[in-house]
């Protein structure tokens, strides 16, 4: 086996091509994984449309949310809990971090390591070629930590845990405890927002209010634990949306706001937050001006980038232990074979689906 099929971006904003890409020799400690499922993320859509960041170049294999089965390992490896892994084990894995810089070794924040590297934007015409997840196989560098997937968790949900869900867990990790009388507002009803809705409800929020669009995503949010939802398409005025939140909070505003939409939603979220409240900023993209007049109100503002390795474990544990409480599979709302990747990306871009998954024969 010298090569495999992959979905390759060869030109921005043009249909991806299904091309054969070399399967590389494994350096010591590297792993070759046969992909079972790769969920798509809004970031994949942004990279497809462009522009690329200065470090990126065409062509590249799209996708950065993989789950797969180990095909081969060059040497011996253990998972993040120290247990041996081998061919046939179903895993997800972390990004690359150097392990020796200040952020990795002293601050213990590898998510901001200057040498951090992730997937879905790496040149597919240069070794090690297979660094995108919408492919039959993927190369896992030796620096990556391996996380075994519990039997109770589907491959599609595990793939989503490899980016979207672990980022949400990072946000809740930074937020800390939710007090039972608190009202939590979730800004965004995509995969991150609906997962955050479930986590907030599970952690004891008195009331979870989810704001987003379109209606099909909000319907999922209600089944994920939202006590009330507000459709942005139906309520277009910001003041009306702020008033809606205040109606549920005796005029004070929310105790916690978790923004999982984009930067433009942050000023709106701050307007919904009570004095002394806590704000978690996860969603990125776009530009916004932060209203500094809110800062004297003793707010606590957390920003979140990606996740730490423990957050993969936390996301998988939540999926496993709460599978009978929340309908996680509803968030993976459409499945496509590799040949239909362009259809999947278009459905994601137009919000027709909450989160699509590309599946591969096992």
Question: What are the residue ranges of the model-derived segments?
Answer:
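C-terminal substrate-binding/catalytic core of Rossmann-like NAD(P)-dependent dehydrogenases/reductases
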Residues: 238-243, 285-333, 342-343, 352-353
């Amino acid at each position: 086996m010298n090569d495999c099929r992959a979905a390759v971006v060869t030109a921005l904003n043009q249909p991806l091509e299904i091309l054969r890409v070399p399967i590389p020799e494994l350096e010591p400690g590297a792993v070759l994984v046969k992909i079972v499922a790769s969920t798509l993320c809004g970031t994949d859509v942004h990279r497809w449309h462009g522009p690329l960041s200065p470090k990126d170049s065409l062509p590249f294999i799209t996708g950065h949310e993989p789950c797969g089965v180990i095909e081969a390992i060059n040497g011996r490896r253990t998972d993040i809990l120290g247990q041996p892994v081998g061919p046939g084990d179903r895993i997800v894995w972390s990004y690359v971090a150097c392990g020796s810089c200040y952020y990795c070794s002293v601050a213990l924040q590898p998510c901001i390591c200057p040498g951090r590297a992730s997937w879905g934007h790496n040149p597919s015409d240069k070794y090690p070629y297979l660094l995108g997840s919408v492919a039959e196989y993927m190369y896992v560098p030796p620096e990556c930590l391996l996380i075994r997937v519990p039997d109770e968790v589907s491959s599609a949900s595990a793939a989503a845990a490899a980016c979207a869900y672990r980022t949400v867990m990072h946000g809740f990790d930074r937020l800390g405890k939710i007090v039972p009388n608190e009202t939590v507002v979730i800004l965004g009803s995509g995969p991150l927002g609906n997962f955050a809705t479930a986590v907030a409800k599970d952690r004891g929020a008195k009331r979870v209010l989810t704001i987003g669009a379109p209606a099909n995503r909000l319907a999922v949010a209600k089944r994920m634990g939202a006590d009330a939802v507000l459709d942005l398409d139906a309520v277009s005025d910001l003041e009306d949306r702020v008033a809606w939140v205040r109606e549920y909070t005796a005029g004070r505003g929310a105790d916690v706001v978790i923004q999982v939409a984009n930067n433009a939603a942050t000023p709106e979220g701050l307007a919904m937050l009570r004095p002394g409240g806590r704000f978690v900023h996860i969603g990125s993209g776009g530009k916004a001006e932060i209203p500094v007049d809110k800062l004297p109100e003793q707010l606590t503002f957390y920003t979140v980038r990606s996740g730490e390795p423990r957050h993969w474990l936390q996301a998988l544990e939540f999926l496993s232990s709460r599978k009978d409480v929340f309908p996680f599979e509803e968030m993976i709302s459409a499945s496509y074979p590799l040949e239909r990747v362009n259809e999947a990306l278009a459905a994601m871009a137009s919000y027709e689906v909450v989160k699509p998954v590309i599946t591969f024969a096992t």
